Amino acid sequence: MYKEKDFDIIVVGAGHAGCEAALATAKMGLQTALFTIYLETIAQLSCNPAIGGLAKGHLVREIDALGGIMAKVTDMAGIQFRMLNRSKGPAVWSLRAQADRILYNIYMRKILESTENLAIKQAMVEEIVVENGKVKGIITSLGVFYGAKAVIITPGTFLNGLIHIGLDSFEAGRAGEFPSKKLSESIKKLGLKMGRLKTGTPPRIDAKTIDFSKTEEQGGDDPPIPFSYSTKKINNPQVPCYITYTNEKTHEIILNNLDRSPLYSGKIKGIGPRYCPSIEDKVVKFRDKSRHQIFLEPEGLSRKEYYANGIPTSLPYDVQVAFVRTIPGLEDAEIMRPGYAIEYDFVYPTQIRHTLEVKGIEGLYLAGQINGTSGYEEAAAQGLMAGINAALKIKKQPPLILGRDEAYIGVLIDDLVTKGTQEPYRMFTSRAEFRLLLRHDNADLRLRDYGYKIGLVDEETYEEFNKKKELLQREIKRLKTTTIKPSEELNKALIEAQTTPVEEATFLDKLLKRPELNYDFIKKFAPSEVTLTKELEELVEIHIKYEGYIAKQMELVERMKQFEEKLIPENFDFNIPGLSREVIQKLTEVAPRTIGQAMRIPGVTPAAISILMVAVQKKTTVKK
């Protein structure tokens, strides 16, 4: 075995989790090595060429607020931006961007290669070296040992990856790339319980063979709203997507060929994503639906490939061709790449801590699909937090654990380590109890201070943020302390807006709280002395309009804090008289760090929590 130089931190896998982890640790001043099987596929958009979407957009904004990179690269590579759910309340507004697959890879690699303290290595990592419960480094397929104080594993779908197209299957981590088999064996040897998951991707269509006149064009927002708080302008040309639908003929072909589907023949054992089902699943489970929506998404400005979002499939190639050509606009479609399903190994995430460090193995961190999640954004968020916490531990500083009331990232990680998952986990706004506090628009107000404190947000960015915060507070104060007197012009405008006129001097915030009025109306009659950006105006309006609801959620957060702050001692014995065997087993497996976390474990009843609280109180009293 050949011994190479040591690093502070080694990151294995250069997907979305790995890139965030490596950049975070390097920016925090630690010597970092990022290992990838193939340099050309760094930050590959393996499935759809898009970032964000419902709740996922929140994660990207939070990554940006903490000092991560995904939002900035998306803005550099974005070719269409849309704010989703505008017709609903601001808590569920989410930004989504179509990204140029080639540009995304180019910009991310350029950033990685220009980052100090970061070395990038093309090598197959096969073994994690652990001695006396502490990570020591990794060994590559060439027998090279690299030492490290911490190792972050972010392998995506590569652990024992197996691709299925019809009844044919072959080993791969992604189409055309080697799987990682020995690394999976190494993880199992460490005693970690592993399972099998599955995901899928649709066929890609040659644009020259699509009749777009038979589809519905869907453009983006104009002007486009960037993901990153630092981005001033989107520079790429913006292009549309196109909508079409399956039909009964499509469904008939699929149903007639289920015997050739690896999903329905029993060949695939892994559990697939509930919220991103294959077209086979949709047709079988929703037989009452005569059609399913398809979004034709451009893969990039320099590519003639379209991603057929809505028809992920693992049916044989000939069946894919047959059913695709029944779809309006795709009658003459040529498939450039067939759809496929991929099975891969994952680690049951109740075996990791909130820091994403593996319980019982000091210095080993897991992030991304290995923890049972699906999606680029969920992976990137975990990668960032694993990197931050690995760096903080080496620096002998307290960990950064985000609460469920602070960030969707906090909800994501707490769900994984507390509840675990048996299927690919996807983030939704409905998973957050405090979603009115965790809005897309206020991610920087929630998290920027953390990013600055740990060293991921630079002075200039932080200064700009503080100026924005000051302007926001000043304008809210002005609206709360300034009155407007009745006038003929004002009351005429109020009547036109279908709201009641004012008869006496009224505070501006009271007017703005009216559902019929917006900030533009207030600005017309009582403009601010300082010009606010559109983003700030929106933030002011949301704060004023939802002030009462926000206050109620804050009260609930404060009530819950008593449980979140009630710590359970390390290595606590949950074998408590009065608890059922099932509850003891669940508490022992998860090893919650607080009473609040214990309350969220499925199957742990309120009665069990009462018994646990008494036992914890006794233990802490005895210690004192």
Swiss-Prot record:
Keywords from the named record: Cytoplasm, FAD, Flavoprotein, NAD, tRNA processing
SUPFAM superfamilies given in the database record: FAD/NAD(P)-binding domain
Keyword match Flavoprotein: yes
Database matches in Pfam families: GIDA, GIDA_C_1st, SAM_GIDA_C
A GO term from the CC aspect: cytosol
PROSITE patterns hit by this protein: GIDA_1, GIDA_2
Residue sites binding FAD per the record: G13, A14, G15, H16, A17, G18, V125, S180, Q369
Annotated binding of NAD(+), by residue: 272-286
Major localization listed first in the record, in broad terms: cytoplasm
Domain of life: Bacteria
The family this protein is said to belong to: Belongs to the MnmG family.
NCBIfam families, per the entry: mnmG_gidA
Name of the protein this chain belongs to: tRNA uridine 5-carboxymethylaminomethyl modification enzyme MnmG
Annotated organism of origin: Thermodesulfovibrio yellowstonii (strain ATCC 51303 / DSM 11347 / YP87)
Gene from which this protein is expressed: mnmG
